[in-house]
Amino acid sequence: MTIMRKKHPLLKLINHSFIDLPAPSNISSWWNFGSLLGVCLMIQIMTGLFLAMHYTSDTTTAFSSVAHICRDVNYGWLIRYLHANGASMFFICLFIHVGRGIYYGSYMLLETWNIGIILFLTTMATAFVGYVLPXXQMSFWGATVITNLLSAIPYIGNTLLEWIWGGFSVDKATLTRFFAFHFILPFIITALVLVHLLFLHETGSNNPSGLNSNSDKIPFHPYYTIKDLLGVLLLLMVLMILVLFFPDILGDPDNYTPANPLNTPAHIKPEWYFLFAYAILRSIPNKLGGVLALILSILILAAFPFLNSSKQHGLVYRPITQFLYWIFIANLLILTWIGGQPVEYPFTTIGQISSILYFTIIVVLMPVANMIENNILXLH
């Protein structure tokens, strides 16, 4: 069997990726989230496939088909809630994975990092089009508001908007194409994940110390397969607690009302994992400015490798930048909270301050902290 796994063209590929892969001996549990994201992706594709068998993308029947899945299909309620809450778990793992990358300086693996940003954007797009599919109140109005942002693009905005809608509002054509996008995007994500891993295995994993670990590598199996398995069990436990005890805690009550184009919900807001970006979008009074800030809030991640001038890898031995990092995380949580609040004082002001702070920490404060820390190093 050993010879088989090392010689067979297909098994050799799997062997070099998951079995005989040389991994640093000191990577912590923060490195578990990559494999957890893989598990989340598999759960989403499998549950999504079964949901697609019973879902209809017509505006007149979409809401009823989701109700039919929950009421009449064997374990349909379970599949539906696994899919909905699985998306939340996906984004929790994604945020931690990116946060770990920033903390430990993994962004210096340029290709892996950039593919990761593309993956992040693709996952956000998938989640957005998926949220529209039940054709309920918040789905409909969320789709209307977010797609409407395209009209802020000069000259071609309105034409582009009507082209994406397939009409003059979110209607049957929109729902059908969003279903098509939602079906194909996870497979594109899977392909991108393979490219992500390909680039990662070219350089090898980063590790908490930030030092070169080539002199101290251990095989991925059995050490990290067992470690990842523990993470997977914990993830599934949290997911099942969510699904079986609090299935609607992360959803919106408005989504249990069929879409009504004549009645606008009091507070239109996206799913919780988009709230930080939504808060940044809302904090700028100008429409085009808001859209640019929204896009930049994610694309700013691509600037990390170029803004980093530190002589040390990662933030483990850099207290000033470490302090800024945790302020940044706290600020992100504040933005998430603000995104779910109505547009009124004091929420708007807090949102504007947090949005400014979000970009200032990354573009100004962290590079300055890098320089200060480099000077402190030079003094010793």
From Swiss-Prot:
A ubiquinone binds at residue 201. Coiled coil: none annotated. The keyword Ribonucleoprotein does not apply. Heme b b566 binds at residues 97, 196. GO terms for molecular function: metal ion binding; ubiquinol-cytochrome-c reductase activity. Binds 2 heme b groups non-covalently. The keyword Transmembrane helix applies. One of its GO terms (biological process) is mitochondrial electron transport, ubiquinol to cytochrome c. The chain crosses the membrane at residues 33-53, 77-98, 113-133, 178-198, 226-246, 288-308, 320-340, 347-367. Its main location: mitochondrion. InterPro entries: Cyt_b/b6_C, Cyt_b/b6_C_sf, Cyt_b/b6_N, Cytb/b6-like_sf, Cytochrome_b, Cytochrome_b_C_euk/bac, Cytochrome_b_N_euk/bac, Di-haem_cyt_TM. GO terms for cellular component: mitochondrial inner membrane; respiratory chain complex III. It holds the Pfam family Cytochrom_B_C. It is found in: Mitochondrion inner membrane. The cytochrome bc1 complex contains 11 subunits: 3 respiratory subunits (MT-CYB, CYC1 and UQCRFS1), 2 core proteins (UQCRC1 and UQCRC2) and 6 low-molecular weight proteins (UQCRH/QCR6, UQCRB/QCR7, UQCRQ/QCR8, UQCR10/QCR9, UQCR11/QCR10 and a cleavage product of UQCRFS1). This cytochrome bc1 complex then forms a dimer. Heme 1 (or BL or b562) is low-potential and absorbs at about 562 nm, and heme 2 (or BH or b566) is high-potential and absorbs at about 566 nm. Belongs to the cytochrome b family. This is Cytochrome b.
